[in-house]
Design a protein with these regions (language model features):
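Hydrophobic faces of well-ordered beta-strands that scaffold small-molecule active sites
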Residues: 27-31, 87-89, 120-122, 146-150, ...
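Acidic (Asp/Glu)-rich catalytic clusters
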Residues: 79-81, 108-115, 135-145, 177-181
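Structural recognition of alpha->loop->beta junctions
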Residues: 49, 111-117, 204-219, 288-303
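Conserved C-terminal portion of the radical SAM core fold
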Residues: 170-229, 245-268
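N-terminal [4Fe-4S]-dependent radical SAM core
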Residues: 1-88, 324-325
Length: 325
């Protein structure tokens, strides 16, 4: 059953933030610009993250402006039936600041040629930004909403090493400081249920994030995809996944630790069904969001509660249910 009522959404919703910021529904269009990662090509490691599906992938830095325009045009056309009027171009696949600076600029420049595009989001790693990259990205803040999305996953270096991330928590802190100095919005990706992490470790990662000057977060569920190192570990019985109920309760716990100014961009896994091994329940995105909202109501919980904030302090909570994030 879908949660209804003014108190249904007890967190700062990214959808609501965008609606208030732009006055209409805003849709993210994902772009694959053909990048790779430094823990795949040997710069810091090989093989990529142990949870990442590498099958059939080959970097393609020959993707240029024309292909970016085509992807954006297709995305805008596909979103029209949903009545989205404005769009954020999201460079999502792999590490989208890992390339020559002039190549990066030529790709980012293309998104602003679409009048419907009001923002740019760039997915990257904390070890793949420097002052030159930050200066380039900061230049676009005059044109619209600009986000750098950092894959952190965990604040514990031993976990980062175990999943072959190839960077440290300190490198993440350095990247946040550098990014914040130029006024670029920061979104952080975390994963609940990583091997070797208990509840306290999962919560500690988010306690640390709550003290940082970040603007958004994506909370992912660890899931197992085909053709990954973790798929082999899972088959060997070396990985225990969170149950649906455990994941829901952990998300509610995490939300209580985050201040209301951090908008929640995602609270679920994002796995292609054809490569997903487990858990199959993570495909039920809208149902999981409903479960989280029910759990918040049952526990009389809301974002920031553990920090002393009240429901009235949530700037982007919904007075009616939002579309799934």
């Amino acid at each position: 059953m879908t949660v209804r009522g003014d108190s249904a959404i007890r967190y700062s919703s990214f959808n609501r933030y965008l609606q208030r910021r732009f006055g209409c529904r805003v849709h993210k269009i994902t772009i694959d610009a053909g990048f790779t990662c430094p823990n795949r090509d040997g710069k810091v490691a090989r093989g990529g993250c142990t949870f990442c599906n590498n099958a059939g992938f080959s970097p393609n830095l020959r993707i240029g402006a024309a292909e970016i325009r085509q992807q954006l045009a297709r995305g805008i056309a596909a979103a029209r039936p949903g009545k989205a009027r404005k769009f954020i171009a999201y460079f999502q696949a792999y590490t989208n600041t890992y390339g020559p600076l002039d190549h990066l600029g030529s790709l980012y420049d293309e998104v602003w040629k679409f009048p419907e595009v009001v923002g740019l989001a760039i997915g990257t790693r904390p070890d793949c930004v420097d002052q030159r990259v930050i200066d380039l990205v900061a230049g676009y803040t005059r044109r619209g909403e600009v986000w750098l999305e950092y894959g952190l996953q965990s604040a514990f270096d031993r976990t980062l090493e175990a999943v072959n991330r190839g960077h440290t928590y300190q490198q993440f802190l350095d990247a946040v400081a550098l990014t914040r100095s130029r006024g670029i919005k920061i979104c952080v990706h975390t994963i609940l249920g990583l091997p070797g992490e208990d509840r306290d470790m999962m919560l500690e990662t988010h306690r640390r994030l709550a003290r940082l000057p970040i603007d958004g977060i994506k909370i992912h569920l660890l899931h197992i995809m085909r053709d990954t190192v973790m798929a082999r570990q899972y088959a060997a019985g070396q990985i225990n996944l969170l149950s649906r109920e455990e994941f829901v309760e952990r998300v509610v716990d995490v939300l209580e630790l985050l201040p209301p100014n951090i908008v929640i961009q995602r609270m679920h896994a994002d796995a292609p069904p054809d490569v997903l091994i487990a858990p199959q329940w993570c495909l039920d995105k809208s149902g999981i969001l409903d479960d989280i909202r029910h759990a918040q109501l049952r526990r009389d919980s809301w974002q920031g509660k553990a920090l002393g904030f009240t429901l009235a302090d949530l700037p982007y909570a919904h007075s009616s249910p939002a579309a799934p994030m």
